Amino acid sequence: SGDVSMRVLAFEDSYDIEKILVEGGVDLSDWELLQYWNTMDCFDRVEEFKPDLLLLDHYIPPIKGLEVLRGLLELVAANQIQRPRMILGISSSSAANEAMEHAGADGSIGKFQLAKHEVWKN
């Protein structure tokens, strides 16, 4: 991808996503990763950072991942925010991840398997 880095925005309140990825062998040199440990002002944060990849935990305060996703997609539909190229649910709960996929996420993966996702191999 040349010298253009891909931008990753993660909403995850319990685990350091960068640490999970690096320990899983992902080379993050082409990625710019930003993690927020809560979902305060989440839509403003997405709008400011303009991520290529959005990672959403479900059980995170104050707004759960599923509600963040629904709200975000409403704003996208209203042309008020640019949709990230890929949105992944990264809950440890497969039921929560399935719910996010039904609501419009592009996919999901348990956060501890995240380093194995094909998105890092591009």
Range-by-range predicted roles:
Residues 28-34:
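A generic structural motif
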Residues 23-27, 45, 99, 103:
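Alpha-helical interaction/dimerization surfaces of two-component signaling modules
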Residues 5-17, 21-25:
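Conserved acidic segment of CheY-like receiver
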Residues 67, 89-117, 121:
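Alpha4 helix (beta4-alpha4-beta5 surface) of REC/receiver domains from two-component response regulators
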Residues 52, 77-87:
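His-Asp phosphorelay/catalytic-motif detector in bacterial-type signaling
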Residues 45-48, 118, 122:
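CheY-like receiver
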Residues 35-53:
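Acidic, metal-coordinating helix/loop segments flanking the phosphotransfer/catalytic sites
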Residues 52-76:
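Conserved phosphotransfer microenvironments
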